[in-house]
Amino acid sequence: AFVVFSTGQKGPSGGASNWGPGFLPSEHQGVMFRSVGDPVLYLSNPKGVDEQIQRDSLHAIKRLNQKHLDVVGDPEIAARINAYELAQRMQLAAPEVMDLSKENEATLKDYGCQPGDGSFASNCLLARRLVEQGVRYVQLFDWGWDFHGTGPGEDIRDGLTNRCKKMDP
């Protein structure tokens, strides 16, 4: 799996192409995690859909996609099947891995973060936890290192000083 976090007022220049698969099959693209709330949209089941209904639905979708793959042979269909399976695994594992409230105080202090603050520091800690759980690649974007003096506190002297304080409290 390939997971992406982004913090700051804007996303990275280049948008989703930064974690897209490029010339590789789409199974190699990254999954953007949000810094606040459910890490992935629709991670939680909607009201009225329990785990069994979801499992049955995903199993039916997989069977249909597999039949289509057998007929057409398009590798994008195989990538779609893998994406659904990854989504289901994330839905089961992500809530626990992404919950920093159970992290000990010393670790939170070392990283300079608080559960739910959506900071770059929290994303670094989440990245570590994901890697510990077997995620092979985590990409972190942090907007706010561009100091061209375009606004208050955005010149190199003040902007860089303030930014470094956030990185190394």
At which residue positions do the language-model features occur?
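Ligand-binding pockets and gating/stacking loops
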Residues: 1-169
